[in-house]
Curated annotation (Swiss-Prot):
Residues 64-92, 132-166 form a coiled coil. Belongs to the Mediator complex subunit 7 family. Gene3D superfamilies: 6.10.140.200. GO terms for cellular component: mediator complex. Its main location: nucleus. Signal peptide: none annotated. Pfam families: Med7. Component of the Mediator complex, a coactivator involved in the regulated transcription of nearly all RNA polymerase II-dependent genes. Mediator functions as a bridge to convey information from gene-specific regulatory proteins to the basal RNA polymerase II transcription machinery. The Mediator complex, having a compact conformation in its free form, is recruited to promoters by direct interactions with regulatory proteins and serves for the assembly of a functional pre-initiation complex with RNA polymerase II and the general transcription factors. InterPro entries: Med7/Med21-like, Mediatior_Med7, Mediatior_Med7_sf. This is Mediator of RNA polymerase II transcription subunit 7a. It is found in: Nucleus. It comes from Arabidopsis thaliana (Mouse-ear cress). Component of the Mediator complex. Interacts with MEE14/CBP1. SUPFAM superfamilies: Mediator hinge subcomplex-like.
Length: 168
């Protein structure tokens, strides 16, 4: 009995048999997924919503102000994290049985840091796209200038060739 190394391909390829003659014969792509979906056993949603720290059961260590100075708050949390790590080292040396409280505090600080950073992700994405688009515009302007320069050079060469041929 012969067995194949790989299973046969799914029958979807038959939907594209006339594609070379008629590209419109291919089936339409499926509609975009809306709401929640399951992928590799995990539930995901298509909505980009950053859950609040309270929803995650973590105390918020920075103000809930809408005019939050992210830079100062990140610095403050970073200093607090460094202090708590040093305190953890002291606790591990002096009172090893009390390390769990310090670990919980450090975990809370890390979660607050991550939440602040994740709240800046949309701004980062916009800034990155703006930068990429500006680079593309600059590259295209350089390409246009290069084409213009080469066109002028070609026109000059043609003019010189014409004058050379005309002078004979």
């Amino acid at each position: 009995m012969a067995t194949a190394t790989y299973p046969p391909p799914p029958p979807y390829y038959r939907l594209y048999k006339d594609y070379s003659e008629n590209p419109n014969s291919a089936p339409e792509p499926p509609p975009p997924i809306e709401g929640t979906y399951v992928c590799f056993g995990g539930n995901y949603t298509t909505e980009d919503v950053l859950p609040s720290l309270e929803e995650q059961g973590v105390p918020q260590l920075y103000p809930k102000d809408s005019n939050l100075d992210y830079k100062n708050e990140l610095r403050s949390l970073n200093r607090e994290l460094q202090l708590h790590i040093l305190e953890l080292a002291d606790v591990l040396v002096d009172r090893p049985s009390q390390y769990a409280k310090r670990i919980g505090e450090i975990s809370s600080i890390f979660k607050n840091l991550h939440h602040l950073l994740n709240s800046l992700r949309p701004h980062q994405a916009r800034a990155t796209l703006i930068h990429i688009m500006e680079l593309q515009i600059q590259q295209r302007k350089q390409a246009v200038e290069d084409i213009k320069r080469r066109r002028e050079e070609a026109q000059r060469l043609l003019k010189d060739a014409y004058l050379t041929l005309d002078g004979q």
